[in-house]
């Protein structure tokens, strides 16, 4: 790796910006004062990284992406807030990620994420490691996306909602409540449809683990039990992944998307 950044002569880099070893900055890109870019990151043509943004190592910021813009919040007063991005992310064309609204606040993108073209991440959002946002996903403020979650194209998520770990959301879904971990949510409005078996297998879940999760799913979403009774019976399964579902439900402030009448079994 070249120990010096490679900056195209038409790019604009602020005097106080810090670029790590091997950083590449393409034609007409803009990196404002105070930005930190980790080694090996590539900022392609016409991308903009605005002040108060820190981006880690080995990221690819594609053409026309704008990172760290001011939040679209009528209450924003110009406070110093931040955008923090981890390592090894792919941020494709036209993606917009805004910094936080509240003084001292952060918008956070983890590591190993893939944000496809024209996805939007609003102020105070948190995106966990390995999450994927497909084309035109739109996250309102304060949304929390769990690790390895997959949001298909055109999904819109209401402010303050949470999407659990290894959850999947179908294309063009409208999300106004929390989406359970390990579960496929789909539709307008969103409904829990089934376990995300493909995603779980990719995450290393074996046959025994899947059977236990299917039973937890059945108790929570496909039985006639009262919620508290279902959670108690789920806890009796003694499984840490099921316990994660229980904790997610108990921590919900907006409620969670339940199964629709046409929802399938957990297969």
Task: Locate the predicted segments by residue.
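Structural signal for interior beta-strand "rungs" in well-ordered beta-sheet cores
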Residues: 6-191
């Amino acid at each position: 790796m070249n120990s010096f950044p490679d900056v195209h002569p038409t790019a604009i880099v602020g005097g106080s910006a810090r670029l790590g070893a091997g950083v590449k900055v393409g034609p007409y890109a803009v990196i404002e004062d105070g930005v930190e870019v980790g080694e090996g990151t590539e900022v392609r043509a016409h991308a903009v990284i605005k002040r108060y943004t820190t981006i880690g190592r080995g990221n690819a910021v594609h053409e026309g992406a704008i990172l760290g813009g001011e939040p679209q919040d009528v209450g924003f007063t110009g406070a110093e807030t931040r955008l923090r991005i981890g390592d090894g992310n792919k941020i494709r064309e036209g993606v917009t990620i805004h910094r936080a609204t509240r003084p001292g606040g952060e918008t956070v993108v983890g590591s190993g994420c893939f944000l496809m073209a024209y996805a939007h991440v609003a102020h105070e959002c948190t995106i966990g490691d390995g999450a994927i946002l497909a084309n035109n996903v739109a996250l309102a403020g304060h949304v929390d996306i769990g690790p390895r979650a997959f949001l298909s194209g055109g999904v819109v998520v209401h402010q303050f909602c949470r999407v659990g770990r290894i959850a999947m959301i179908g294309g063009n879904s409208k999300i106004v409540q929390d989406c359970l971990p390990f579960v496929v949510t789909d539709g307008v409005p969103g409904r829990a449809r089934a376990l995300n078996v493909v995603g779980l297998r990719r995450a290393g879940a074996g046959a025994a683990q899947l059977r236990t999760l299917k039973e937890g799913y059945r108790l929570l979403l496909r039985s006639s039990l009262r919620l508290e009774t279902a959670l108690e019976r789920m806890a009796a399964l003694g499984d840490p992944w099921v316990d994660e579902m229980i904790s997610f439900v108990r921590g919900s402030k907006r409620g969670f998307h339940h199964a629709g009448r046409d929802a399938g079994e957990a297969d």
